[in-house]
Amino acid sequence: MDTSGHFHDSGVGDLDEDPKCPCPSSGDEQQQQQPPPPPPPPAPPAAPQQPPGPPLQPQPLQLQQQQQQQQQQPPHPLSQLAQLQSQPVHPGLLHSSPTAFRAPPSSNSTAILHPSSRQGSQLNLNDHLLGHSPSSTATSGPGGGGRHRQASPLVHRRDSNPFTEIAMSSCKYSGGVMKPLSRLSASRRNLIEAEPEGQPLQLFSPSNPPEIIISSREDNHAHQTLLHHPNATHNHQHAGTTASSTTFPKANKRKNQNIGYKLGHRRALFEKRKRLSDYALIFGMFGIVVMVIETELSWGLYSKDSMFSLALKCLISLSTIILLGLIIAYHTREVQLFVIDNGADDWRIAMTYERILYISLEMLVCAIHPIPGEYKFFWTARLAFSYTPSRAEADVDIILSIPMFLRLYLIARVMLLHSKLFTDASSRSIGALNKINFNTRFVMKTLMTICPGTVLLVFSISLWIIAAWTVRVCERYHDQQDVTSNFLGAMWLISITFLSIGYGDMVPHTYCGKGVCLLTGIMGAGCTALVVAVVARKLELTKAEKHVHNFMMDTQLTKRIKNAAANVLRETWLIYKHTKLLKKIDHAKVRKHQRKFLQAIHQLRSVKMEQRKLSDQANTLVDLSKMQNVMYDLITELNDRSEDLEKQIGSLESKLEHLTASFNSLPLLIADTLRQQQQQLLSALMEARGVSVAVGTTHTPLSDSPIGVSSTSFPTPYTSSSSC
């Protein structure tokens, strides 16, 4: 075996190792070399072990002789091939590295590779397979002159050779051949592919033979491409496969990623996406804070052309650039998650028009910021009460500073990614089963359900402060009386607009201030409706409180019904008393009791109507758990009754079986009774016969029976009625 990983033929089944493997380049050099002695003929199976011969140099004449001998050689017996199953397999030779089968040129390794060095076998299985595999042999051109065999650990399965199939199947089922590399798990294949190509040299020994692996042709082709790609001495043979050999590892690595790797990679992407969102929010809020500081300081302390303003604007620009990079990285993680979740091969599949538009809009919103430098424009407005036009020179930074508050949408993203409902696996699984989309809207709904007051308070205060500062910035160039340009005055204007009061003592002058007030009024109307809903929910009775209230009302109505019924009976008795029992009828008292009687009847009817309404209201309060308990009680009672019925039916069946057995035994009892009576009668007749004989009376027998009585005269259970 040479350093390039090739075996050279030196005979039938012989492998010769030469570290240099010289190849004659011309006919003169081939004639100068002396031909080696002819190879020894193959020994029979029972021949003793022979020492290995000296290393031979491959010559053209010798190669022709070897080919003729190999064609004339009979097939080897299968008993020689089956003995390889008892040889141990070294686990480290499973790698597909080209150096895994290299061995130093020593006598021990040569003797081991020689087929006659093993007891009881004349042919190595690896040599036999390589000799019968046309895909592993290559004949060089006329200038090369030599036939070499590739030393690959993977051996092709030949369907046309029945001996190879029988030997391989025998070794496979007996444990002599390991499973192919293509059938390994994806994790082991990833580990094999991840290992470097440079493996330590493995020495061949009787206790450590090379492993033979049976695999498919596709795997052999891929691994042979990987084996021959690093060898510089075979670049002229594999020039066409160099480009394809670089693509095979990537394709195999992508295909061999199992579900465990994908889940781990997906979890890592989730964590990276959350950290990127946090960093983006930090830099976005930092830019807003620096923008507010720069705007306030440039209005009161220094001008826009100072170094302090330039430094703060440069800081804002730097934070904006970092923010844009974080947003790009965030959406990159989003695309990677889409590829993993949907099993896509190309990331461009995830880049839909909607996603591209969303990313572009987000980049545009986050890219707006004050540009370093001093830029001004003339701003014309009309004053509110005097309706006179006002023209002032304003900074362009106002137009670029106010849209920076749109970066606050990052807060909703961070809330979503940090929510327990979004990060918890159990909640995500339950939501997926119920077809719930975990987005920002769902998280806000849960927050409004859990703590509605806190959410509304934080939202209202934040909107109040931001809108007041925006109105102050918009109105300070045209407010000569310092009314709306004052921060406290702007807060008063926003508050009365938010609550939809509108006193009219303060009004904005510019369209910028009017637009902010319009948005504030819309937000105020929505927040007011939410506050009313939250207050109504807080004032509403709970289910337990409603049950208690209904119980108390039912008790009071029951008492009122009893009182009304008692009043009806009382007035009925009094009417009967004054009309029937008294001698002199007092019509005034009768009419009085009749009025009270009618009032009692109407009161009884009204109380019953209230009780009916209360019962209807109570029926609507029956929740699912109570209904479930009632149904459970009913089902339990039905089960108990069915069990009792089954017990009764079982007792009846046992009694019927007892009666049936009694009726079946009745004929036997009757037969036994009749038999006993017949025996008693016969015994009585025998006694009477004995007494008559003793007296000396001559008796003529009536029949052939010894007692003179025919047996047919006495019926038995087995005789018919006609014989009696």
Curated annotation (Swiss-Prot):
Q: What is its main location?
A: membrane
Where composition is biased (Pro residues), the residues are 34-58
Sequence positions bearing Phosphoserine: 160
Q: Where is this region: Calmodulin-binding?
A: 554-630
Where does it reside? Answer: Cell membrane; Cytoplasm, Myofibril, Sarcomere, Z line
Instruction: Respond yes or no to whether keyword Cytoplasm is given for this record.
Output: yes
Which parts of the chain span the membrane according to its record?
281-301, 308-328, 359-379, 398-418, 447-467, 516-536
Chain intervals with Basic and acidic residues compositional bias: 1-11
Q: Which residues lie within the membrane without crossing it?
A: 487-507
Which regions form coiled coils?
635-662
| The keyword RNA-binding is annotated on this UniProt entry | no
Q: Which UniProt keywords apply?
A: Calmodulin-binding, Cell membrane, Coiled coil, Cytoplasm, Ion channel, Ion transport, Membrane, Phosphoprotein, Transmembrane, Transmembrane helix, Transport
Assembly, per entry: Homodimer. Heteromultimer with KCNN2 or KCNN1; this modulates plasma membrane expression and consequently the small conductance calcium-activated potassium channel activity. The complex is composed of 4 channel subunits each of which binds to a calmodulin subunit which regulates the channel activity through calcium-binding. Interacts with CALM1.
Q: What is known of its domains?
A: The coiled-coil domaim mediates heteromeic assembly.
Return the protein name: Small conductance calcium-activated potassium channel protein 3
| Organism of derivation | Sus scrofa
What's the gene?
KCNN3
